[in-house]
């Protein structure tokens, strides 16, 4: 079974022809991930180390959040505070482009906005849906954190 799908010449409206192009299957994309990670690690090992730190800390905080018996008396906004502290502390170890104060202001504003909307979302969606929505929010927050670390 071939991993590559070839598409032949396609005639366009103006008579121009598109040359063959290749569509990669997901297995090919997955095979390229280690090579990309290796090249990023060779260029700047701090980025890889920082990514592992962020991923590990957000995973631990997420696991603590799913053990709701620890947080019944505190409330759901406490977890957002913990995640903010984790993100802000890790900001000091990988500073590129923006200054630390600009990054902290941007990340705190985004997390504060989400914390303010949290009780309304919980009432609307219920506890089960809230737990399911927490993971994509964490991923989006990690991506936002990564974007904030990009130089201009």
From Swiss-Prot:
Pfam families: ALMT. It comes from the Eukaryota. This is Putative aluminum-activated malate transporter 11. It comes from Arabidopsis thaliana (Mouse-ear cress). GO terms for cellular component: membrane. Malate transporter. Signal peptide: none annotated. It is a multi-pass membrane protein. GO terms for biological process: malate transport; monoatomic ion transmembrane transport. The chain crosses the membrane at residues 48-68, 78-98. The keyword Membrane applies. The gene is ALMT11. Its main location: membrane.
């Amino acid at each position: 079974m071939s991993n590559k799908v070839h598409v032949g010449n396609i005639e366009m409206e103006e008579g121009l022809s598109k040359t063959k192009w290749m569509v990669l299957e997901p297995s090919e994309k997955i095979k390229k991930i280690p090579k990309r990670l290796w090249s990023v690690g060779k260029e700047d090992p701090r980025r890889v180390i920082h990514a592992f730190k962020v991923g590990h800390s957000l995973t631990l905080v997420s696991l603590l959040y799913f053990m709701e018996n620890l947080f019944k008396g505190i409330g759901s906004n406490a977890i957002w505070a913990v995640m903010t502290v984790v993100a802000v502390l890790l900001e000091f170890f990988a500073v590129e482009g923006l200054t630390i104060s600009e990054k902290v202001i941007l990340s705190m504003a985004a997390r504060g906005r989400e914390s303010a909307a949290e009780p309304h979302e919980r009432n609307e969606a219920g506890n089960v849906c809230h737990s399911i929505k927490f993971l994509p929010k964490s991923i989006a927050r990690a991506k936002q954190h990564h974007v904030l670390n990009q130089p201009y």
